[in-house]
């Protein structure tokens, strides 16, 4: 326990909570432009995205197959990918240049698919 004199000399510092998605700067989503990431793996689809806030982040492309190329404009939301270290963002499908997932029947809202007629 510190003495009162020690507390007067230097007060207790409040603990700062660190954000899990700092590049979004407190916004729910942000827009960005894609640059392809190095391995362009067939196993996991990720993209380097330059945000309007100036950050360069790695974002995961959910769902089967995608139409994204270099200079595509995408919307990015928070949410990490467990087995990919350093990937803390998801690209929102069905908005801007990211097309919805084809022939999706269940969990459609997560992949930007409209209700089938």
From Swiss-Prot:
What name does this protein carry? Small ribosomal subunit protein uS12c
What are the UniProt keywords, alphabetically? Chloroplast, Plastid, Ribonucleoprotein, Ribosomal protein, RNA-binding, rRNA-binding
Q: Where in the cell is it found?
A: Plastid, Chloroplast
- Where is the major localization of this protein? plastid
Self-association or partners: how does it assemble?
Part of the 30S ribosomal subunit.
Species of origin reads Pinus koraiensis (Korean pine)
Q: Family assignment?
A: Belongs to the universal ribosomal protein uS12 family.
Q: Which GO terms describe its biological process?
A: translation
What segment(s) does the record annotate as region Disordered? 9-40
GO terms under cellular component? chloroplast; small ribosomal subunit
């Amino acid at each position: 326990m510190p003495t009162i004199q020690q507390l007067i000399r230097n007060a207790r510092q409040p603990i700062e909570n660190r954000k899990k998605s700092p590049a979004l700067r407190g916004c729910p989503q942000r827009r960005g432009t894609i640059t392809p990431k190095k391995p362009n793996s067939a196993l996991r689809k990720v993209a380097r995205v330059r945000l309007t806030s100036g950050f360069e982040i790695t974002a995961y492309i959910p769902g089967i197959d995608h139409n994204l190329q270099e200079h595509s404009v995408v919307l990015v939301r928070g949410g990490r990918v467990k087995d990919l270290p350093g990937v803390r963002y998801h690209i929102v499908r069905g908005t801007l240049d990211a097309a919805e997932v084809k022939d999706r029947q269940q969990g459609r809202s997560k992949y930007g698919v409209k209700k089938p007629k």
